[in-house]
Protein backbone atom coordinates (compact mmCIF):
# COMPACT_ATOMS: atom_id res chain seq x y z
CA UNK A 1 0.00 0.00 0.00
CA UNK A 2 1.50 3.37 -1.05
CA UNK A 3 0.57 5.35 2.03
CA UNK A 4 2.31 6.30 5.27
CA UNK A 5 1.22 7.90 8.53
CA UNK A 6 2.56 11.38 9.21
CA UNK A 7 3.35 12.81 12.68
CA UNK A 8 0.02 14.66 12.73
CA UNK A 9 -1.83 11.37 11.94
CA UNK A 10 -2.54 12.66 8.36
CA UNK A 11 -2.53 9.81 5.84
CA UNK A 12 0.03 10.71 3.14
CA UNK A 13 -0.21 9.12 -0.31
CA UNK A 14 2.94 8.26 -2.29
CA UNK A 15 3.67 7.43 -5.93
CA UNK A 16 4.27 3.68 -6.20
CA UNK A 17 6.95 4.23 -8.88
CA UNK A 18 9.15 7.16 -7.79
CA UNK A 19 8.17 7.35 -4.09
CA UNK A 20 7.30 11.07 -4.09
CA UNK A 21 4.49 12.19 -1.78
CA UNK A 22 1.27 13.85 -2.91
CA UNK A 23 2.71 17.22 -1.76
CA UNK A 24 5.81 16.89 -4.03
CA UNK A 25 3.88 16.36 -7.28
CA UNK A 26 1.04 18.15 -9.08
CA UNK A 27 -1.24 15.12 -9.45
CA UNK A 28 -1.45 11.62 -7.98
CA UNK A 29 -3.71 9.14 -9.78
CA UNK A 30 -5.06 6.13 -7.87
CA UNK A 31 -5.31 2.56 -9.15
CA UNK A 32 -6.11 -0.72 -7.39
CA UNK A 33 -3.87 -0.35 -4.31
CA UNK A 34 -1.27 1.70 -6.31
CA UNK A 35 -0.69 5.36 -7.20
CA UNK A 36 1.16 7.04 -10.07
CA UNK A 37 2.19 10.72 -10.23
CA UNK A 38 2.03 13.09 -13.24
CA UNK A 39 5.84 13.10 -13.56
CA UNK A 40 5.99 9.30 -13.96
CA UNK A 41 3.15 9.44 -16.51
CA UNK A 42 5.14 11.98 -18.59
CA UNK A 43 8.22 9.76 -18.39
CA UNK A 44 6.23 6.69 -19.53
CA UNK A 45 4.78 8.64 -22.47
CA UNK A 46 8.28 9.73 -23.52
CA UNK A 47 9.58 6.14 -23.41
CA UNK A 48 6.63 4.88 -25.50
CA UNK A 49 7.10 7.70 -28.07
CA UNK A 50 10.82 6.95 -28.46
CA UNK A 51 10.24 3.21 -28.88
CA UNK A 52 7.42 3.75 -31.39
CA UNK A 53 9.61 6.09 -33.47
CA UNK A 54 12.35 3.47 -33.79
CA UNK A 55 10.17 0.35 -34.04
CA UNK A 56 10.71 -1.57 -37.24
CA UNK A 57 12.84 1.17 -38.83
CA UNK A 58 16.16 -0.57 -39.25
CA UNK A 59 16.51 1.42 -42.42
CA UNK A 60 14.26 3.90 -44.14
CA UNK A 61 13.64 1.25 -46.80
CA UNK A 62 11.58 -1.13 -44.64
CA UNK A 63 8.30 0.74 -45.10
CA UNK A 64 8.31 0.65 -48.89
CA UNK A 65 10.09 -1.17 -51.69
CA UNK A 66 13.45 0.07 -52.92
CA UNK A 67 12.92 2.46 -55.86
CA UNK A 68 14.26 1.32 -59.23
CA UNK A 69 17.24 3.08 -60.87
CA UNK A 70 14.83 4.93 -63.20
CA UNK A 71 12.77 6.13 -60.21
CA UNK A 72 15.91 7.24 -58.37
CA UNK A 73 17.05 9.12 -61.49
CA UNK A 74 13.61 10.79 -61.86
CA UNK A 75 13.76 12.08 -58.28
CA UNK A 76 17.34 13.32 -58.75
CA UNK A 77 16.10 15.21 -61.84
CA UNK A 78 13.70 17.18 -59.62
CA UNK A 79 16.56 18.60 -57.55
CA UNK A 80 19.70 18.45 -59.72
CA UNK A 81 19.90 20.05 -63.18
CA UNK A 82 22.21 18.50 -65.79
CA UNK A 83 24.89 15.89 -64.98
CA UNK A 84 22.79 13.20 -66.71
CA UNK A 85 25.48 10.51 -66.88
CA UNK A 86 26.50 11.05 -63.23
CA UNK A 87 22.86 10.69 -62.12
CA UNK A 88 22.51 7.43 -64.05
CA UNK A 89 25.73 6.01 -62.55
CA UNK A 90 24.66 7.02 -59.03
CA UNK A 91 21.14 5.61 -59.46
CA UNK A 92 22.48 2.18 -60.47
CA UNK A 93 25.20 2.13 -57.77
CA UNK A 94 22.83 3.12 -54.95
CA UNK A 95 20.12 0.69 -56.13
CA UNK A 96 22.61 -2.20 -56.22
CA UNK A 97 24.02 -1.26 -52.80
CA UNK A 98 20.66 -1.27 -50.98
CA UNK A 99 19.42 -4.30 -52.96
CA UNK A 100 22.51 -6.10 -51.65
CA UNK A 101 21.67 -5.06 -48.07
CA UNK A 102 18.09 -6.35 -48.37
CA UNK A 103 19.42 -9.80 -49.28
CA UNK A 104 22.26 -10.03 -46.75
CA UNK A 105 20.48 -12.69 -44.68
CA UNK A 106 20.15 -15.08 -47.62
CA UNK A 107 22.89 -17.71 -47.70
CA UNK A 108 24.56 -17.93 -51.09
CA UNK A 109 27.88 -18.95 -52.60
CA UNK A 110 28.29 -15.55 -54.27
CA UNK A 111 29.09 -12.69 -51.88
CA UNK A 112 28.33 -9.25 -53.29
CA UNK A 113 30.96 -6.64 -52.48
CA UNK A 114 30.17 -3.02 -51.66
CA UNK A 115 30.44 -0.39 -54.40
CA UNK A 116 31.51 2.92 -52.89
CA UNK A 117 31.42 5.95 -55.17
CA UNK A 118 33.92 8.63 -56.24
CA UNK A 119 32.50 11.88 -57.65
CA UNK A 120 34.88 14.05 -59.67
CA UNK A 121 33.79 17.53 -60.74
CA UNK A 122 34.41 21.26 -60.30
CA UNK A 123 33.15 23.34 -57.38
CA UNK A 124 29.42 23.99 -57.51
CA UNK A 125 28.65 21.22 -60.02
CA UNK A 126 26.25 19.35 -57.71
CA UNK A 127 28.36 16.64 -56.00
CA UNK A 128 27.13 17.32 -52.45
CA UNK A 129 23.55 17.95 -53.58
CA UNK A 130 23.43 14.58 -55.35
CA UNK A 131 24.56 12.76 -52.18
CA UNK A 132 22.12 14.73 -49.98
CA UNK A 133 19.20 14.05 -52.33
CA UNK A 134 19.97 10.31 -52.39
CA UNK A 135 19.99 10.11 -48.58
CA UNK A 136 16.71 12.06 -48.35
CA UNK A 137 15.10 9.86 -51.02
CA UNK A 138 16.11 6.63 -49.25
CA UNK A 139 15.38 8.01 -45.76
CA UNK A 140 18.71 6.84 -44.35
CA UNK A 141 21.10 8.63 -41.94
CA UNK A 142 23.50 10.95 -43.76
CA UNK A 143 26.59 12.92 -42.80
CA UNK A 144 28.98 15.22 -44.68
CA UNK A 145 32.64 15.17 -43.65
CA UNK A 146 35.40 17.49 -44.83
CA UNK A 147 38.55 15.51 -45.62
CA UNK A 148 40.77 18.58 -45.07
CA UNK A 149 39.95 18.62 -41.32
CA UNK A 150 40.99 14.99 -40.82
CA UNK A 151 44.35 13.86 -39.46
CA UNK A 152 45.84 10.55 -38.40
CA UNK A 153 44.91 9.26 -34.94
CA UNK A 154 47.16 10.79 -32.29
CA UNK A 155 47.65 14.12 -34.10
CA UNK A 156 45.84 17.42 -33.58
CA UNK A 157 42.69 17.46 -35.70
CA UNK A 158 39.69 15.24 -36.33
CA UNK A 159 40.08 11.48 -36.16
CA UNK A 160 38.42 9.62 -39.08
CA UNK A 161 36.18 7.81 -36.58
CA UNK A 162 34.60 11.19 -35.76
CA UNK A 163 32.75 10.78 -39.07
CA UNK A 164 30.93 7.71 -37.69
CA UNK A 165 30.27 9.57 -34.44
CA UNK A 166 28.47 12.33 -36.40
CA UNK A 167 26.50 9.71 -38.35
CA UNK A 168 25.38 8.16 -35.04
CA UNK A 169 24.35 11.58 -33.72
CA UNK A 170 22.20 12.11 -36.83
CA UNK A 171 20.16 8.98 -36.04
CA UNK A 172 19.96 9.38 -32.23
CA UNK A 173 22.66 6.75 -31.63
CA UNK A 174 20.65 3.92 -33.22
CA UNK A 175 23.50 1.68 -34.34
CA UNK A 176 21.44 -0.44 -36.78
CA UNK A 177 20.33 2.66 -38.68
CA UNK A 178 23.84 4.15 -38.73
CA UNK A 179 25.28 0.91 -40.15
CA UNK A 180 23.11 1.36 -43.27
CA UNK A 181 23.62 5.10 -43.72
CA UNK A 182 25.45 7.22 -46.29
CA UNK A 183 28.69 9.12 -45.61
CA UNK A 184 29.78 11.86 -48.02
CA UNK A 185 33.47 12.81 -47.72
CA UNK A 186 34.11 16.13 -49.47
CA UNK A 187 37.45 17.52 -50.69
CA UNK A 188 38.94 14.01 -50.96
CA UNK A 189 41.41 15.39 -53.54
CA UNK A 190 42.93 17.70 -50.90
CA UNK A 191 44.43 14.73 -49.00
CA UNK A 192 46.38 13.44 -51.99
CA UNK A 193 50.00 12.48 -51.53
CA UNK A 194 52.27 15.49 -51.83
CA UNK A 195 54.70 13.60 -54.09
CA UNK A 196 55.26 10.16 -55.61
CA UNK A 197 58.29 9.58 -53.40
CA UNK A 198 57.90 8.71 -49.70
CA UNK A 199 59.10 11.57 -47.52
CA UNK A 200 61.08 11.38 -44.27
CA UNK A 201 58.61 13.81 -42.66
CA UNK A 202 55.19 12.48 -41.67
CA UNK A 203 52.33 13.46 -44.01
CA UNK A 204 49.64 13.51 -41.26
CA UNK A 205 46.94 15.13 -43.38
CA UNK A 206 47.70 13.37 -46.68
CA UNK A 207 48.63 9.72 -47.20
CA UNK A 208 48.20 8.99 -43.49
CA UNK A 209 44.56 10.08 -43.61
CA UNK A 210 44.01 8.04 -46.77
CA UNK A 211 45.28 4.95 -44.93
CA UNK A 212 42.96 5.68 -41.99
CA UNK A 213 39.99 6.25 -44.33
CA UNK A 214 40.79 3.02 -46.16
CA UNK A 215 39.95 0.92 -43.08
CA UNK A 216 36.70 2.82 -42.58
CA UNK A 217 35.64 2.57 -46.24
CA UNK A 218 36.42 -1.13 -46.71
CA UNK A 219 34.69 -2.10 -43.45
CA UNK A 220 35.86 -2.10 -39.84
CA UNK A 221 34.49 -1.98 -36.30
CA UNK A 222 34.72 1.71 -35.39
CA UNK A 223 34.85 2.54 -31.67
CA UNK A 224 32.79 5.64 -30.94
CA UNK A 225 32.57 7.36 -27.52
CA UNK A 226 28.99 7.43 -26.18
CA UNK A 227 27.00 10.65 -26.66
CA UNK A 228 29.81 12.51 -28.39
CA UNK A 229 32.35 12.49 -25.55
CA UNK A 230 36.13 12.42 -26.02
CA UNK A 231 37.97 9.10 -26.03
CA UNK A 232 39.72 7.93 -22.87
CA UNK A 233 40.91 4.44 -21.89
CA UNK A 234 38.45 3.74 -19.05
CA UNK A 235 35.17 4.17 -20.91
CA UNK A 236 32.86 1.92 -22.88
CA UNK A 237 32.68 2.53 -26.62
CA UNK A 238 29.83 2.05 -29.06
CA UNK A 239 30.92 -0.44 -31.73
CA UNK A 240 29.76 0.43 -35.27
CA UNK A 241 30.39 -1.91 -38.21
CA UNK A 242 31.11 0.22 -41.30
CA UNK A 243 30.93 -2.72 -43.75
CA UNK A 244 27.48 -1.76 -45.05
CA UNK A 245 27.78 2.03 -44.87
CA UNK A 246 27.82 3.57 -48.36
CA UNK A 247 30.76 5.96 -48.75
CA UNK A 248 30.59 8.65 -51.43
CA UNK A 249 33.79 10.66 -51.87
CA UNK A 250 33.87 13.89 -53.85
CA UNK A 251 36.45 16.39 -55.01
CA UNK A 252 37.28 18.95 -57.70
CA UNK A 253 40.61 17.28 -58.58
CA UNK A 254 42.07 20.45 -60.12
CA UNK A 255 44.86 19.45 -62.50
CA UNK A 256 43.60 15.89 -63.04
CA UNK A 257 42.65 16.68 -66.65
CA UNK A 258 46.33 17.52 -67.36
CA UNK A 259 47.36 14.09 -66.01
CA UNK A 260 44.75 12.44 -68.26
CA UNK A 261 45.81 14.46 -71.33
CA UNK A 262 49.49 13.58 -70.74
CA UNK A 263 48.60 9.88 -70.61
CA UNK A 264 46.31 9.91 -73.65
CA UNK A 265 48.79 11.92 -75.74
CA UNK A 266 51.53 9.39 -74.98
CA UNK A 267 49.32 6.48 -76.05
CA UNK A 268 47.72 8.33 -78.98
CA UNK A 269 50.75 8.39 -81.31
CA UNK A 270 50.97 7.08 -84.87
CA UNK A 271 48.54 6.49 -87.73
CA UNK A 272 44.90 6.30 -86.65
CA UNK A 273 45.56 8.27 -83.46
CA UNK A 274 43.07 10.95 -82.52
CA UNK A 275 44.17 14.35 -83.81
CA UNK A 276 41.79 16.33 -81.59
CA UNK A 277 43.99 18.74 -79.62
CA UNK A 278 43.58 19.33 -75.90
CA UNK A 279 42.51 22.92 -76.62
CA UNK A 280 39.49 21.55 -78.53
CA UNK A 281 38.40 19.30 -75.67
CA UNK A 282 36.19 20.38 -72.81
CA UNK A 283 37.53 19.63 -69.27
CA UNK A 284 34.43 17.54 -68.52
CA UNK A 285 35.02 15.50 -71.68
CA UNK A 286 38.63 14.85 -70.62
CA UNK A 287 37.62 13.83 -67.07
CA UNK A 288 35.27 11.16 -68.46
CA UNK A 289 38.40 9.30 -69.64
CA UNK A 290 39.83 9.04 -66.11
CA UNK A 291 41.54 5.77 -65.22
CA UNK A 292 42.78 4.48 -61.83
CA UNK A 293 46.38 5.16 -62.91
CA UNK A 294 45.52 8.87 -63.35
CA UNK A 295 44.17 9.06 -59.80
CA UNK A 296 47.31 7.32 -58.49
CA UNK A 297 49.45 9.84 -60.38
CA UNK A 298 47.32 12.63 -58.85
CA UNK A 299 48.14 11.37 -55.35
CA UNK A 300 45.49 8.91 -54.16
CA UNK A 301 46.81 5.60 -52.85
CA UNK A 302 45.98 2.51 -54.97
CA UNK A 303 44.24 0.74 -52.06
CA UNK A 304 41.75 3.60 -51.59
CA UNK A 305 41.05 3.82 -55.34
CA UNK A 306 40.32 0.08 -55.28
CA UNK A 307 37.68 0.66 -52.59
CA UNK A 308 35.95 3.33 -54.75
CA UNK A 309 35.10 1.27 -57.84
CA UNK A 310 32.23 3.45 -59.10
CA UNK A 311 33.54 6.70 -60.61
CA UNK A 312 31.17 9.43 -61.84
CA UNK A 313 32.43 12.66 -63.39
CA UNK A 314 30.47 15.92 -63.38
CA UNK A 315 30.98 18.65 -65.95
CA UNK A 316 31.22 22.39 -65.45
CA UNK A 317 27.76 24.01 -65.54
CA UNK A 318 27.22 26.40 -68.44
CA UNK A 319 25.06 29.55 -68.51
CA UNK A 320 21.91 27.70 -69.63
CA UNK A 321 22.24 25.07 -66.88
CA UNK A 322 22.77 27.74 -64.20
CA UNK A 323 19.67 29.63 -65.37
CA UNK A 324 17.66 26.39 -65.13
CA UNK A 325 19.03 25.74 -61.64
CA UNK A 326 17.68 29.14 -60.55
CA UNK A 327 14.08 28.32 -61.52
CA UNK A 328 13.45 24.61 -62.22
CA UNK A 329 14.31 22.40 -59.19
CA UNK A 330 11.72 21.79 -56.46
CA UNK A 331 13.66 23.98 -54.04
CA UNK A 332 14.96 26.44 -56.68
CA UNK A 333 16.41 29.71 -55.39
CA UNK A 334 13.90 31.90 -57.24
CA UNK A 335 11.02 29.86 -55.75
CA UNK A 336 12.50 30.37 -52.27
CA UNK A 337 12.73 34.14 -52.70
CA UNK A 338 9.20 34.26 -54.17
CA UNK A 339 8.00 32.60 -50.97
CA UNK A 340 9.93 35.06 -48.77
CA UNK A 341 8.41 38.05 -50.58
CA UNK A 342 4.93 36.47 -50.51
CA UNK A 343 5.20 36.43 -46.72
CA UNK A 344 5.35 40.24 -46.96
CA UNK A 345 2.35 40.12 -49.36
CA UNK A 346 4.60 41.35 -52.19
CA UNK A 347 5.10 39.76 -55.61
CA UNK A 348 8.71 39.28 -56.76
CA UNK A 349 9.52 39.27 -60.48
CA UNK A 350 13.03 38.32 -61.58
CA UNK A 351 13.23 38.89 -65.33
CA UNK A 352 15.03 36.49 -67.73
CA UNK A 353 17.78 39.08 -68.36
CA UNK A 354 18.45 39.13 -64.60
CA UNK A 355 18.68 35.32 -64.47
CA UNK A 356 21.19 35.45 -67.34
CA UNK A 357 23.23 38.12 -65.52
CA UNK A 358 23.29 35.98 -62.34
CA UNK A 359 24.50 32.94 -64.33
CA UNK A 360 27.21 35.00 -66.10
CA UNK A 361 28.43 36.39 -62.77
CA UNK A 362 28.65 32.88 -61.23
CA UNK A 363 30.68 31.67 -64.23
CA UNK A 364 33.08 34.64 -63.91
CA UNK A 365 33.55 33.89 -60.21
CA UNK A 366 34.09 30.17 -60.97
CA UNK A 367 31.72 29.24 -58.13
CA UNK A 368 29.20 27.22 -60.16
CA UNK A 369 25.73 26.71 -58.68
CA UNK A 370 27.10 27.27 -55.17
CA UNK A 371 27.62 30.99 -55.86
CA UNK A 372 24.10 31.71 -57.15
CA UNK A 373 22.57 32.39 -53.73
CA UNK A 374 25.19 34.96 -52.69
CA UNK A 375 24.72 36.88 -55.98
CA UNK A 376 20.93 36.97 -55.61
CA UNK A 377 21.13 37.78 -51.90
CA UNK A 378 23.44 40.72 -52.62
CA UNK A 379 21.05 42.07 -55.27
CA UNK A 380 18.00 41.80 -53.00
CA UNK A 381 19.61 42.90 -49.72
CA UNK A 382 18.53 46.57 -49.75
CA UNK A 383 14.96 45.89 -50.78
CA UNK A 384 14.58 43.08 -48.21
CA UNK A 385 15.91 45.48 -45.55
CA UNK A 386 13.49 48.29 -46.46
CA UNK A 387 10.39 46.31 -47.46
CA UNK A 388 8.96 45.40 -44.00
CA UNK A 389 8.73 49.11 -43.10
CA UNK A 390 7.20 50.18 -46.43
CA UNK A 391 3.49 50.60 -47.04
CA UNK A 392 1.59 49.91 -50.24
CA UNK A 393 4.28 47.98 -52.16
CA UNK A 394 2.64 45.28 -54.30
CA UNK A 395 5.51 44.13 -56.55
CA UNK A 396 9.33 44.17 -56.81
CA UNK A 397 10.98 43.83 -60.25
CA UNK A 398 14.62 42.74 -60.66
CA UNK A 399 16.36 43.34 -64.00
CA UNK A 400 19.93 42.68 -65.20
CA UNK A 401 21.11 46.18 -64.24
CA UNK A 402 20.32 45.37 -60.57
CA UNK A 403 22.46 42.21 -60.73
CA UNK A 404 25.32 44.10 -62.43
CA UNK A 405 25.18 46.82 -59.76
CA UNK A 406 24.10 49.58 -62.18
CA UNK A 407 20.55 50.01 -60.90
CA UNK A 408 18.10 49.37 -58.09
CA UNK A 409 15.00 47.15 -57.90
CA UNK A 410 11.81 48.68 -59.27
CA UNK A 411 9.04 48.86 -56.67
CA UNK A 412 5.45 48.83 -57.90
CA UNK A 413 3.13 50.60 -55.47
CA UNK A 414 -0.61 50.27 -55.52
CA UNK A 415 -0.77 53.76 -57.06
CA UNK A 416 2.57 54.37 -58.92
CA UNK A 417 6.03 52.79 -59.53
CA UNK A 418 9.16 53.83 -57.59
CA UNK A 419 12.80 52.78 -57.40
CA UNK A 420 14.07 51.21 -54.13
CA UNK A 421 15.96 53.70 -51.98
CA UNK A 422 14.33 56.75 -53.60
CA UNK A 423 12.03 59.10 -51.65
UniProtKB/Swiss-Prot annotation:
<dbReference type="InterPro" id="IPR004487">
    <property type="entry name" value="Clp_protease_ATP-bd_su_ClpX"/>
</dbReference>
<dbReference type="InterPro" id="IPR010603">
    <property type="entry name" value="Znf_CppX_C4"/>
</dbReference>
<feature type="domain" description="ClpX-type ZB">
    <location>
        <begin position="3"/>
        <end position="56"/>
    </location>
</feature>
<dbReference type="GO" id="GO:0009376">
    <property type="term" value="C:HslUV protease complex"/>
</dbReference>
<dbReference type="GO" id="GO:0140662">
    <property type="term" value="F:ATP-dependent protein folding chaperone"/>
</dbReference>
<dbReference type="Pfam" id="PF10431">
    <property type="entry name" value="ClpB_D2-small"/>
</dbReference>
<dbReference type="GO" id="GO:0046983">
    <property type="term" value="F:protein dimerization activity"/>
</dbReference>
<keyword id="KW-0143">Chaperone</keyword>
<feature type="binding site">
    <location>
        <begin position="122"/>
        <end position="129"/>
    </location>
    <ligand>
        <name>ATP</name>
    </ligand>
</feature>
<dbReference type="GO" id="GO:0051082">
    <property type="term" value="F:unfolded protein binding"/>
</dbReference>
<keyword id="KW-0479">Metal-binding</keyword>
<feature type="binding site">
    <location>
        <position position="15"/>
    </location>
    <ligand>
        <name>Zn(2+)</name>
    </ligand>
</feature>
<keyword id="KW-0067">ATP-binding</keyword>
<dbReference type="InterPro" id="IPR046425">
    <property type="entry name" value="ClpX_bact"/>
</dbReference>
<dbReference type="GO" id="GO:0051603">
    <property type="term" value="P:proteolysis involved in protein catabolic process"/>
</dbReference>
<dbReference type="InterPro" id="IPR019489">
    <property type="entry name" value="Clp_ATPase_C"/>
</dbReference>
<feature type="binding site">
    <location>
        <position position="37"/>
    </location>
    <ligand>
        <name>Zn(2+)</name>
    </ligand>
</feature>
<dbReference type="GO" id="GO:0008270">
    <property type="term" value="F:zinc ion binding"/>
</dbReference>
<comment type="similarity">
    <text>Belongs to the ClpX chaperone family.</text>
</comment>
<feature type="binding site">
    <location>
        <position position="40"/>
    </location>
    <ligand>
        <name>Zn(2+)</name>
    </ligand>
</feature>
<feature type="binding site">
    <location>
        <position position="18"/>
    </location>
    <ligand>
        <name>Zn(2+)</name>
    </ligand>
</feature>
<dbReference type="InterPro" id="IPR038366">
    <property type="entry name" value="Znf_CppX_C4_sf"/>
</dbReference>
<comment type="function">
    <text>ATP-dependent specificity component of the Clp protease. It directs the protease to specific substrates. Can perform chaperone functions in the absence of ClpP.</text>
</comment>
<protein>
    <recommendedName>
        <fullName>ATP-dependent Clp protease ATP-binding subunit ClpX</fullName>
    </recommendedName>
</protein>
<comment type="subunit">
    <text>Component of the ClpX-ClpP complex. Forms a hexameric ring that, in the presence of ATP, binds to fourteen ClpP subunits assembled into a disk-like structure with a central cavity, resembling the structure of eukaryotic proteasomes.</text>
</comment>
<dbReference type="GO" id="GO:0005524">
    <property type="term" value="F:ATP binding"/>
</dbReference>
<dbReference type="Pfam" id="PF07724">
    <property type="entry name" value="AAA_2"/>
</dbReference>
<dbReference type="GO" id="GO:0051301">
    <property type="term" value="P:cell division"/>
</dbReference>
<keyword id="KW-0547">Nucleotide-binding</keyword>
<dbReference type="InterPro" id="IPR050052">
    <property type="entry name" value="ATP-dep_Clp_protease_ClpX"/>
</dbReference>
<dbReference type="InterPro" id="IPR027417">
    <property type="entry name" value="P-loop_NTPase"/>
</dbReference>
<dbReference type="Pfam" id="PF06689">
    <property type="entry name" value="zf-C4_ClpX"/>
</dbReference>
<dbReference type="GO" id="GO:0016887">
    <property type="term" value="F:ATP hydrolysis activity"/>
</dbReference>
<keyword id="KW-0862">Zinc</keyword>
<dbReference type="InterPro" id="IPR003593">
    <property type="entry name" value="AAA+_ATPase"/>
</dbReference>
<dbReference type="InterPro" id="IPR003959">
    <property type="entry name" value="ATPase_AAA_core"/>
</dbReference>
Amino acid sequence: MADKKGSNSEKLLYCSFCGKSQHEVKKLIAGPSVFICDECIDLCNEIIRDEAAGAGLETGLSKSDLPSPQEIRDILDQYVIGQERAKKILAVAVYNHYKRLKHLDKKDDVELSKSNILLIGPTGSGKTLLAQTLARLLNVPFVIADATTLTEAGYVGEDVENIIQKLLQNCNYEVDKAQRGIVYIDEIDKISRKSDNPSITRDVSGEGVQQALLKLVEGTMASVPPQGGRKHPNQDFIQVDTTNILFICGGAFDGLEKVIVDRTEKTGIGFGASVKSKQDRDAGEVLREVEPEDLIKFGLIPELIGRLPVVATLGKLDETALMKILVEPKNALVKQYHKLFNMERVELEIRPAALQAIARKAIRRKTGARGLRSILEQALLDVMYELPAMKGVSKVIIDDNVIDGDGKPLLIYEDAPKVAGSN
